[in-house]
Amino acid sequence: SLGKTIKKLNVKYTSLNCDVNDYKRIKNNIIKLKKLDILVNNAGTNIPEPFLKVTGSSLETLLNVNTKAVFNVAQLCANQIIKLNKKNGSIINISSIFGLVAGRDRTVYSMTKFGVEGLTRGMALDLAKYNIRVNSVCPNIVLTPRTKKYFANKKYNKYVKESTPLDKVATIS
């Protein structure tokens, strides 16, 4: 896990694993932090659907998790970084390759990740005066316990490998 990797580097970190739609809980956790230098803003979900079949429920879920929650966490953390650390900070929004290019049956997902890209660029401009750097990371499809079932499909696996420059699937460590 990322936590194990960070521990090996002998770096102090706090991991907040919570429902990103629970604004009050997130806010309460963030304002309790005594030190905050870096945010890795990693919230996201995907509901693959053809555009003409997208339901109101899936639209709302994707907007809330992929865009609204990313905004809320970033804003809360930026305010806390400014309050606690007058020198500098860094916010890294985890986006997606689908925030740069569209994907079939990923219209809403792409829309939300394009939103993260716009948010990141706007934040970078607004937070520069506080010496807070803001960037995004746009991975392709990542093999996780949640996505493992898709990789069992040979056609899907081939598609992912062919759409990745290094001809291999990203994994989490």
List each language-model region with its residue ranges.
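The beta1-alpha1 cofactor-binding region of Rossmann-like NAD(H)/NADP(H)-dependent oxidoreductases
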Residues: N17-K27, G56, I172-S173
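Residue(s) in the substrate-gating loop at a strand-loop-helix junction
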Residues: S96
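Alpha-helical segment proximal to the catalytic Tyr-Lys
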Residues: N79, L125-K129
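Active-site helix of classical SDR
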Residues: A74, T112, T120
